[in-house]
Amino acid sequence: MIHYVTPDLCDAYPELVQVVEPMFSNFGGRDSFGGEIVTIKCFEDNSLVKEQADQPGAGKVLVVDGGGSLRRALLGDMIAEKAAKNGWEGLVIYGCVRDVDVLAQTDLGVQALAPHPMKTDKRGIGDLNVVVTFASVTFRPGEYVYADNNGVIVSPSPLKMPE
């Protein structure tokens, strides 16, 4: 597993990276993560998050545009454990998570807005692999996202940590 340091990536690739507004906190067991973007757009319904966690995710990060809702958690321990088991590098969630003590022990990167104890309704509503924009950055499927305790950045191409 590669350890990413977003300040070093910003210094090495200033013309490539976009910095996501600093509103996210680390809830996962990995201090840093990065990979190819897979997007989901959903609102208070994590059906697609659950479906994608069941898919192979090596080298990929699930970017979830939850509309910034602070009323429901889009990720909990069971989905996070499935995502980790299926090789996902992490998730960036414009929304909330729950079971935060378990998430902190799970081998998965998780950046989200806040904890919230209430689960979502599963109605099967949402869009997969669409362009999403939040926190002043546009996330496109197939581009790359990197995250650590300093922040979240996006690049159109993969970045290597400087020597």
UniProtKB/Swiss-Prot annotation:
GO terms for biological process: regulation of RNA metabolic process. It catalyses: 4-hydroxy-4-methyl-2-oxoglutarate = 2 pyruvate; oxaloacetate + H(+) = pyruvate + CO2. Its cofactor is a divalent metal cation. Substrate binds at G76, D77, M78, I79, R98. Divalent metal cation. GO terms for molecular function: 4-hydroxy-4-methyl-2-oxoglutarate aldolase activity; metal ion binding; oxaloacetate decarboxylase activity; ribonuclease inhibitor activity. CDD domains: RraA_family (cd16841). Keywords: Lyase, Metal-binding. Its EC number is 4.1.3.17, 4.1.1.112. InterPro entries: RraA (IPR010203), RraA/RraA-like (IPR005493), RraA/RraA-like_sf (IPR036704). A divalent metal cation binds at D99. Belongs to the class II aldolase/RraA-like family. This is Putative 4-hydroxy-4-methyl-2-oxoglutarate aldolase. It comes from Pseudomonas fluorescens.
